Amino acid sequence: MKKTANKVVLIGAGSVGTSFLYAAINQGIAEHYVLIDAFPQPAEGNALDLSDTLAVIPHSFTSIKAGSYEDCKDADVVVITAGRPQKPGETRLEMVAGNAEIMKNIATEVKKSGFDGITVIASNPVDVITHVYQKVTGFDPHKVIGSGTTLDSARLRRLVGQKLNVKPESVQAYVAGEHGDSSVAIWSQANIMGRPILDYVKCGCLTLEDLDQIQKDTVDMAYKIINLKRATFYGIGACLTKIVNAVLRDEKSTLMVGAQLNGEYKNKDLYTGVPAIIGSNGWERIIEWDLTKEEQEKFDKSCETLHKTIDSVKHLFE
């Protein structure tokens, strides 16, 4: 029987997961939501709390409940945010051992449920964790999406907009590679309403030092937020909503997600942040830009860093 309503299952009902759910509910992207968590009581409490919005945000959704992995079977999208949170001063890659084990267990349960939809993952270190999930499940790589550098790119756009006093929505600027310290700002592709960002350097509105500082601030933003409030969740929650909405609406939007490289950008056998077209089939195609020599070298180094981390957890899926 043909389904007439979208169903989204969230695995990991902590701050990131519930921030995603609240944003998704406000935008009305799905009809049915299910929360799964290792601690059932908070999941049930969050489901009840969010259900109270039905009276305030009409037509936003039909049902929300705490559930189990069996609920994944007929879901359109499974969103995974489960894992240990990042500590102050800790890099994302330093979280890999524990969170990779957690993801292996989740992946096993999701596959066992008979799920055949699209998976969107934000658990850190997201590039490596997405790779682990795909290897353990054996799912079509196109149907497994990492949050990639969507948040990094959003931060970059905001910082460029602040520097030039323009709305961030008018800025097209992108971060590729690892969602982490080795990420790369792709300035050669950045523009403001079609005008290349490097033109602003030529006319004196920006300096190359400004661009370097903006990239550094983009990388450091997570550490700053974690030091101030122990976790980041609103920004990534909004980014997850954008990705899931693109899947459910078959938008064919180009987003900086974690997609599996198979020779694109001269790298392969890993997930990392690249521009990809997102629709009902997952990430449908990677867009390949002509990177500068410096950008390509930095991207290669970022991929090398990820490969080394992947090697440390290969025993989980080989």
Curated annotation (Swiss-Prot):
Keywords from the named record: Cytoplasm, NAD, Oxidoreductase, Phosphoprotein
UniProt modified residues of type Phosphotyrosine: Y223
Record GO biological process: glycolytic process; lactate metabolic process
Binding-site residues for NAD(+), renumbered to this chain: V16, D37, Y69, A122, S123, N124, S147
Enzyme class: oxidoreductase
Molecular function GO terms recorded: L-lactate dehydrogenase activity
Active site residues of this protein: H179
Catalytic activity: (S)-lactate + NAD(+) = pyruvate + NADH + H(+)
CDD domains: HicDH_like
Transmembrane segments: none
Subunit-level organization: Homotetramer.
Family as reported in the entry's similarity comment: Belongs to the LDH/MDH superfamily. LDH family.
Known role: Catalyzes the conversion of lactate to pyruvate.
Name of the protein: L-lactate dehydrogenase
Species whose genome carries this gene: Mycoplasma mycoides subsp. mycoides SC (strain CCUG 32753 / NCTC 10114 / PG1)
The encoding gene: ldh
